[in-house]
């Protein structure tokens, strides 16, 4: 199924409350977009720690993971019983075992901090095969790759994983979609990927009369 980039102005996600696409009730790890003890607004993302570990994000885990979440962990049998209960979909989520606090660097402005958090959110979107959010897809892709290089050890693997993610999300489906073509053209220039750049460029040329109507045009022009 084709997945679409979600456009959001800065004001739409400024609070970073629970992200419905990245909040899994059975997840055992809570992700907070602030320093520990500096806010009471709660976690923004709830996912499985095993999935994070499977994504080869060792530096990210070493830097941010906290093991002393206050709740008592549930056993697998407890989780099975919980899932089978009649009120499962309306019941409170089971307690989490782990927490991660991922604050923006202190020197960033308010707008820069927002963009930092947005990229952190998109890092998890890549991890769990969800669409990206942001104002411009090209910028979001480049920011995500930079964050992957920070949080994962192998840049070559990161590039391959990003290209696979673009295909999975439908961002390389350029048919009648100048947004995708321009965004991937910009991203391929950053990546220095000749094949991807050429494919995006050819589609841009074929849609030349639509390019200036795209939100990506000023960024990539």
Please place each PLM-identified region on the residue numbering.
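Post-BTB helical module
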Residues: 102-221
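BTB/POZ (also called T1 in voltage-gated K+ channels) oligomerization domain detector
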Residues: 1-151
């Amino acid at each position: 199924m084709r997945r679409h980039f979600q456009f959001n102005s800065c004001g739409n996600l400024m609070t970073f409350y629970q992200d419905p696409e990245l909040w899994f009730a059975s997840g055992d790890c809570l992700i907070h977009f602030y320093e520990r003890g500096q806010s009471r607004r709660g976690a923004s993302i709830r996912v499985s720690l095993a999935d994070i570990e499977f994504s080869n994000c060792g530096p990210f885990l070493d830097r941010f993971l906290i093991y002393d979440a206050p709740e008592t962990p549930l056993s697998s049998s407890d989780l099975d019983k919980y899932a089978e209960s009649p009120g499962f979909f309306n019941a409170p989520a089971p307690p989490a075992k782990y927490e991660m606090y991922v604050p923006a660097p202190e020197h960033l402005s308010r707008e820069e901090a927002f963009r930092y958090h947005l990229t952190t959110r998109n890092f998890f979107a890549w991890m769990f095969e969800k669409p990206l959010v942001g104002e411009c897809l090209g910028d979001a892709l480049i920011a995500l790759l930079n964050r992957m290089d920070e949080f994962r050890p192998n840049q070559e693997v990161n590039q391959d994983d990003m290209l696979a993610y673009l295909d999975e999300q439908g961002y390389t489906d350029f048919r009648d979609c100048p947004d995708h073509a321009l965004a991937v053209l910009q991203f391929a220039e950053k990546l220095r990927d000749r094949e991807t750049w050429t494919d995006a460029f050819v589609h841009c040329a074929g849609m030349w009369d639509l390019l200036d109507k795209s939100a990506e045009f000023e960024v990539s022009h």
